[in-house]
């Protein structure tokens, strides 16, 4: 068995040796053993691959000189494994590049022959290539493209299972290895040329704009934290491609996280290609369950879209128990029994953990639906919850057409304010008061909850007025929210939802930055659950 990482690896030559090539993936939650050998600031993919090699005791590795991180991985491994080879990968596919890559493949064959003490047979390679020789399937306009850095196979499969369109994977793991070798008299050189003619990755100098079909339904673009390659292409696509575009950022130990899957599901819903079971609207009562990180909210409506009852309880250690409890309270408040309920839709981060729901829908779609129902003049929804914040753009019909999320940390969220209230020794209710008149206009320089807490402690030690500190914290939260608004562009009217919408100080700070009043619903915490209930009623 020999491990490899790159699609330009001569996998078929390894197979011709009678060996098993295994694509190395990154996805380990901990890089503890890898970080003992490689700097902690190294690319997360390279660290994950190193962790994989250590975990599975892989003794043979072939790498390509894709980037500096992979070159450093080679440096670490060259005295740790029995066999390692680094292929120099050209950036072009002109005749000189083909000659260079051909020579690199010859060097690998010679090195592997010496290591294995066996001869390479071209006839074996020819048989393998002929078995992989057929025409590639044509692209379909009714497709969604995945670009950028490689995504884990299970995430790709979830996207395929979740949408009605064909998924075309343009990342380095997506293309099927097919070959049409014509010059069989110089098999290895033709093979080298075929490898360089694979769909170009960001390592190559070839123009990748030809990959994009203008009739695609949308693009999911994956970037790696701190990787130099992909953000440049994403920025160009964002400015030039007239297609729905979703950017996700992973470090390979979080690509299957609830936040990332929420973004993907919401994107598929907004483009109209999310798989949904078709249902007819029925008479009766309809329930929306919003299982959030901090609170669980339930709304019951009737067939005329009247809110019959709702409940809000803290989300405990188990999302399912909280959902059951909130559902029971809402039923009791409405004087109903479970048998009276026609349909239930679940949303929020815990939506997949609610087995009694008939369907699940992302909170992006549900907040948009609920906000537009409350006020159909709303075009931008600012939702600040316990652990994340998001801004949602609606069209004139209330459909979600764009959204941005801050879900990587608790900066600018309800949790941020709770920590600061505890540090100040006051209740969250006291902190929610508006402090328009301040003695000193203090600025909190860090949005990181940990560092901001240290700043607050320092301000307390300097005997700063508590109201001035609260005002500074409200400004910090508002600044984070406004940065999200500006990423999708300002467009009124604005509605604020989520528990933080009850904080008058934050609301005032955001209004001051926007220069426009926010619409605050009668109960901002239930808007997601209300949207879920409306979707349950409409049966779409």
What residue spans do the PLM features occupy?
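Glycine-rich phosphate-binding/hydrolytic loop that grips phosphoryl groups
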Residues: 262, 417, 521-540
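Glycine-rich phosphate-binding loop plus the immediately following alpha-helix
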Residues: 101, 315-319, 396-397, 401-436, ...
């Amino acid at each position: 068995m020999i491990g490899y990482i790159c699609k330009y690896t001569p996998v078929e030559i390894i197979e011709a040796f009678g060996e098993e090539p295994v694509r190395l993936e990154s996805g380990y939650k901990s890089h503890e053993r890898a970080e003992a050998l490689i700097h902690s600031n190294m690319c997360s993919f390279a660290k994950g691959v190193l962790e994989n090699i250590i975990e599975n005791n892989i003794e043979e590795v072939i790498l390509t000189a894709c980037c500096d991180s992979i070159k450093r991985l080679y440096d670490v491994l060259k005295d740790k494994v029995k066999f390692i080879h680094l292929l120099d990968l050209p950036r072009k596919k002109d005749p000189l590049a083909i000659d260079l890559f051909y020579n690199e493949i010859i060097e690998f064959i010679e090195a592997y022959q010496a290591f294995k003490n066996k001869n390479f047979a071209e006839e074996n390679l020819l048989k393998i290539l002929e078995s992989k020789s057929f025409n590639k399937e044509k692209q379909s306009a009714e497709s969604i493209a995945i670009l950028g850095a490689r995504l884990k196979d299970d995430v790709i499969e979830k996207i395929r299972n979740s949408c009605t369109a064909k998924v075309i994977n343009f990342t380095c793991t997506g293309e099927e290895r097919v070959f049409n070798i014509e010059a069989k008299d110089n098999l290895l050189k033709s093979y080298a040329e075929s490898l360089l003619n694979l769909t170009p990755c960001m390592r190559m100098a070839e123009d990748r704009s030809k990959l994009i079909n203008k009739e695609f339904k949308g693009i999911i673009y994956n970037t790696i934290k701190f990787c130099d390659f992909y953000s440049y292409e994403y920025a160009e696509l964002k400015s030039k491609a007239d297609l729905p575009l979703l950017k996700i950022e992973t470090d390979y130990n979080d690509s299957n996280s609830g936040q990332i899957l929420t973004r993907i599901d919401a994107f598929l819903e907004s483009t109209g290609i999310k798989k949904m079971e078709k249902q007819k609207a029925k008479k009766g009562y309809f329930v929306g369950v919003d299982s959030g990180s901090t609170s669980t909210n339930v709304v019951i409506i009737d067939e005329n879209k009247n809110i019959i009852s709702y409940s809000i309880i803290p989300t405990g250690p188990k999302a399912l128990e909280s959902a059951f409890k909130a559902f029971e309270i809402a039923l009791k408040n409405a004087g109903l029994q479970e048998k009276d309920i026609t349909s239930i839709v679940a949303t929020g981060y815990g939506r997949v953990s609610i087995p009694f729901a008939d369907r699940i829908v992302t909170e992006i779609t549900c907040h948009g639906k609920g906000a537009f129902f409350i006020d159909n003049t709303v075009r931008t929804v600012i939702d600040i919850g316990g652990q994340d914040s998001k801004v949602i753009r609606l069209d004139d019909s209330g459909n979600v057409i764009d959204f941005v999320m801050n879900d990587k940390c608790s900066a600018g969220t309800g949790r941020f304010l709770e920590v600061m209230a505890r540090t100040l020794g006051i209740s969250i209710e006291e902190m929610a008061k508006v402090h328009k008149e301040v003695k000193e206009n203090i600025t909190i320089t860090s949005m990181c909850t940990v560092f901001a807490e240290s700043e607050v402690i320092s301000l307390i030690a300097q005997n700063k007025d508590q109201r001035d500190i609260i005002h500074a914290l409200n400004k910090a939260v508002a600044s984070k929210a406004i940065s999200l608004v500006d990423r999708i562009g300002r467009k009124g009217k604005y509605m604020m939802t989520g528990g933080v919408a009850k904080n008058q100080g934050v609301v005032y700070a955001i209004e001051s930055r926007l220069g426009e009043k926010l619409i605050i619903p009668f109960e901002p915490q239930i808007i997601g659950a209300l949207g879920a209930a409306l979707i349950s009623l409409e049966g779409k």
